[in-house]
């Protein structure tokens, strides 16, 4: 299987040596479950796309510092690409954080900066609905998060299958072809911590401190990798 990674941002230059690019993170995360997966990378901020959707078996949209409600031209192009994939429904599509939000917005949902403020650290989501590909079974799971924007209203064909009081729409599906996560299963805890430290001045101290403490636990990245691989291969 070949996964097309649609890169929507760059890792800060001083962190690349330790953590790699966002595509590197995605590849390492998924290859712990499927070493034979192949990957192609597309810098969609620079309007670089596959010449044809058939180039890859599935696509994944990464996280980004951008907001989905900005009006940059590359966002409009990517939104149309999302709709094209969804309408064809022959390719699986995965969204992470920004990718999760942009897919929701592109398909008719609503995203904006939440009045609840920052979500940072390890966030636990409760499973509302268990899908067949969610093996091993789990009632809840934890993933790194760092976001202010979040999904406020789902598209009519979408279903929230996991969430929490702070972020009710943490995981969303659209039939059998689209799966999106607000959390970052591809992020190491140390990368989340590095991003938090860079943004400490714009967070409330209590939120920042609680987020750091939460990183004492371990994320369920491998569990979610199993789920995503099952979803892609079903």
Provide a role label for each language-model segment:
Residues 18-21, 54-56, 73-76, 107-111, ...:
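Short, glycine/charged-enriched secondary-structure capping and boundary segments
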Residues 2-8, 12-15, 25, 87, ...:
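Amide-donor transfer/coupling interface in amidating biosynthetic enzymes
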Residues 46-50, 119-120, 152, 168-169:
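A short acidic, often aromatic-flanked loop/helix-cap motif at beta-alpha or helix-coil junctions
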Residues 1-73, 77-87, 209-234:
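N-terminal beta1-alpha1 cap of cysteine-dependent amidohydrolase-like domains
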Residues 62-131:
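Cysteine-nucleophile active-site neighborhood
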Residues 42-44, 114, 146, 163:
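Conserved beta-strand termini and adjacent loop/short-helix elements that scaffold enzyme active sites
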Residues 32, 45-46, 99, 148-150, ...:
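Short, polar loop motifs at secondary-structure junctions
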Residues 38-40, 110, 142, 159:
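Conserved beta-strand segments of alpha/beta enzyme cores
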């Amino acid at each position: 299987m070949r996964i097309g990674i649609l890169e929507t941002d760059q890792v800060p230059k001083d962190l690349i040596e330790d953590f790699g690019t966002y595509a590197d993170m995605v590849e390492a995360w998924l290859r712990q479950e499927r070493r034979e997966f192949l990957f192609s990378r597309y810098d969609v901020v620079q309007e670089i796309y596959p010449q044809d959707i058939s180039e890859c078996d599935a696509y994944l949209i990464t996280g980004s510092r951008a907001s989905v409600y900005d009006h940059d031209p590359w966002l409009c192009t990517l939104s149309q690409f999302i709709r094209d994939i969804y309408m064809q429904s022959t390719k699986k599509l995965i969204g992470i954080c920004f990718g999760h939000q942009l897919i929701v917005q592109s398909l008719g949902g609503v995203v904006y900066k939440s009045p609840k403020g920052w979500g940072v650290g390890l966030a636990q989501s409760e499973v509302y609905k268990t899908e067949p590909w969610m093996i091993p079974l789990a009632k809840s799971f934890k993933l790194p998060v760092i976001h202010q924007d979040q999904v406020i209203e789902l598209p009519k064909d979408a279903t929230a299958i996991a969430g929490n009081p702070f972020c009710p729409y943490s995981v969303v599906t659209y039939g059998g072809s689209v799966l999106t996560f607000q959390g970052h299963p591809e992020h190491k805890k140390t990368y989340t911590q590095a991003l938090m430290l860079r943004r400490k001045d714009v967070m409330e101290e209590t939120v920042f401190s609680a987020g750091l403490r939460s990183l004492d636990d371990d994320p369920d990245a491998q569990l979610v990798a199993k789920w995503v691989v099952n979803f892609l291969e079903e």
